[in-house]
Amino acid sequence: MTECWYIPEEVADRREENRLSPNVPGSYEALSEARVFFRHFDPKEVSDDIEGFIQPLLKKLNYHSYDVVNLSPATLGDEKFEALAEQHFMEHTHEDDEVRLILEGQGYFDVRDANDKWIRLLSKPGDCIVLPAGMYHRFTTDHSKCIKTLRIFKEAPRWIALNRGPETEEKPARKEYLARLHAPAETAVGAANSHTIFSLHYPLKLDAELTVITKRLLEQHSKQPLALMIFLTGSTDPTTGASWCPDCIPAKPQVAQRFAELQGKYGEERAIFLQLPVERAGYLGNPEYPYRKHPTLQLASVPTLLVLTPTKDAKEKGDVQWYDRLEVKMRTCDIDKADVLSLE
């Protein structure tokens, strides 16, 4: 996904960019919340070479079958191409995940976000997109009318387009998708409960959201100490079922142990946990990634664990950011050796 942005419900020409005015950019975090996964491969390395590229890719991602789809008037003829183009742009879903890697050309995937708004994804060679089963989406080429994609499957696919409507809403895949979409976020220490366990997905909204949470917690526990543990970890890769960050996988049980120790020290109601998932596509190779430049987080690598406690005058401070009320007592990437019991 080279870029993504929100588009209106109705568009006059599907092959135009159709941005809102003013433009409203999408984000990797909004896509992640909708369970869409994105990964980029070097465009020079992707091809329809079965032995040289496709078979090694299938093995790496633990997929078992594939096909190559070449859409253009030159390959299909004008009439068949336009008929397929109309069909692909109907809002629909599938009973299996849709995994597409762009080999040549470019086009737009439109997907519904968690609030049922359209996000348009500009997809070029090297872009790999995973759309979960049960998610409404549609596709169109741009005005070039030419795209070649590799589709890969875990098993033999049930590749039937289910157009949006009452019958599709009752399909198991759709119900399961909605259940996952609205389920509490899972963290290293349990499901988020908006009480003592939180998961915030949007880096650009972090300060506003955490400032509200921090102020409320300080008011609730005005006479007793509390501690906030922040865990920055790689988000889950649906092609493998695990974090894209290898070091983050063994770190999770270690974080759970450190948090249990924090609960023992401060009490279960006053030990607060916040997990911040880090999206691979937005983070890797990006020195401007918000958590890297954040004055308190100062993310250098994942996983990273921080523990913060209120400043002495935290309760007296007026309208300030969360990081002005809290001070960092511990910051580490070596979570197994972190000593939360010695915090003052």
UniProtKB/Swiss-Prot annotation:
Its cofactor is Fe(2+); Ni(2+). Ni(2+) binds at H92, H94, E98, H137. Binds either 1 Fe or Ni cation per monomer. Iron-binding promotes an acireductone dioxygenase reaction producing 2-keto-4-methylthiobutyrate, while nickel-binding promotes an acireductone dioxygenase reaction producing 3-(methylsulfanyl)propanoate. InterPro entries: ARD (IPR004313), ARD_euk (IPR027496), RmlC-like_jellyroll (IPR014710), RmlC_Cupin_sf (IPR011051), Thioredoxin-like_sf (IPR036249), TXNDC17_dom (IPR010357). Keywords: Amino-acid biosynthesis, Cytoplasm, Dioxygenase, Iron, Metal-binding, Methionine biosynthesis, Nickel, Nucleus, Oxidoreductase. GO terms for biological process: L-methionine salvage from methylthioadenosine. GO terms for cellular component: cytoplasm; nucleus. The keyword Acetylation does not apply. Its EC number is 1.13.11.54, 1.13.11.53. It is found in: Cytoplasm; Nucleus. It holds the Pfam family ARD. One of its GO terms (molecular function) is nickel cation binding. Its main location: cytoplasm. Gene3D superfamilies: Glutaredoxin, Jelly Rolls. Pathway: Amino-acid biosynthesis; L-methionine biosynthesis via salvage pathway; L-methionine from S-methyl-5-thio-alpha-D-ribose 1-phosphate: step 5/6. It comes from the Eukaryota. Fe(2+) binds at H92, H94, E98, H137. It catalyses: 1,2-dihydroxy-5-(methylsulfanyl)pent-1-en-3-one + O2 = 4-methylsulfanyl-2-oxobutanoate + formate + 2 H(+); 1,2-dihydroxy-5-(methylsulfanyl)pent-1-en-3-one + O2 = 3-(methylsulfanyl)propanoate + CO + formate + 2 H(+). Catalyzes 2 different reactions between oxygen and the acireductone 1,2-dihydroxy-3-keto-5-methylthiopentene (DHK-MTPene) depending upon the metal bound in the active site. Fe-containing acireductone dioxygenase (Fe-ARD) produces formate and 2-keto-4-methylthiobutyrate (KMTB), the alpha-ketoacid precursor of methionine in the methionine recycle pathway. Ni-containing acireductone dioxygenase (Ni-ARD) produces methylthiopropionate, carbon monoxide and formate, and does not lie on the methionine recycle pathway. Belongs to the acireductone dioxygenase (ARD) family. This is Acireductone dioxygenase. It comes from Leishmania braziliensis. The lineage of its organism: Eukaryota, Discoba, Euglenozoa, Kinetoplastea, Metakinetoplastina.
